[in-house]
């Protein structure tokens, strides 16, 4: 026979009411008491009856996650944060991929409504504001990484301006004074915000990032390779901020082929901290980390608060951090630049 909540209460030495509060994360109690209840439930392989709970709470303990334009490189860490924050005991996650198809998106919204999900997280490949979902949906919606163009919606995204500032600061810390930037398409919001951050850091040091030292192109290795060759043939630079790790790897390959020493002659900082690329680059690529796993956790926590009736409208931004490797190894003295537990910053 499956264990009941009375069995949990008896084994943990608490009342049924206390056991219920401990399992549902409700009420005030000592942390060790709550942990004892959870440990006991795990030992007895207790599985709560969600159908019974739904009758009293009106909840289904399911949350949807809708990707509007397919699964990209940034989806897995964000998804991992969402899943770990919700956990098996809090809610199940239903994944839906709209693939840039409005009909498919509408279908999934209908399915999620029919399944009576408690809430929905919407994400995408870019941070650019996206058209909002209908506000008539019967559940709260939170936008993660991608943002809603409606300021009344709840959005959590990356602070790309801060990331650009961090990258330039690291190059300055390395001793660089003539810094170039090779990045993605100027049409991308994140590209423009990162440039603004880099220029702010350089201005604080009495320097500038002139337009002739900024190169735009696809987020690809060949962009970095070709731009670096052209740059080194015409300009004297001692640091390059790369708009992605793929671009950074292309830059490193080009510099290596020209006999340019990294970081002695030219230091490099990438963006994304895509470890598969950054660690395979020679030398290892220092990179800005967008803390996407943490962003996923924060998104799930914010959605749960909205489900409880406490929405948090507006756009909030998660600061970035640095992963230091051999391409720009200057030590960091400010620990907030490499810790990923910075608080969310609301838009002004």
Model-derived segments and spans:
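N-terminal helix-turn-helix DNA-binding module of bacterial transcription factors
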Residues: 1-60, 345-348
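Amphipathic helical "hinge" segments at domain boundaries
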Residues: 31, 35, 44-111, 115-118, ...
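Hinge/beta->alpha junction and helix N-cap segments in small-molecule ligand-binding domains
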Residues: 50, 68-77, 95-104, 156-166, ...
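Flexible loop/hinge segments that line or gate small-molecule binding clefts
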Residues: 100, 122-166, 246, 272-285
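Periplasmic-binding protein-like
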Residues: 116-124, 180-182, 214, 235-246, ...
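Flexible loop/turn connectors
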Residues: 234-348
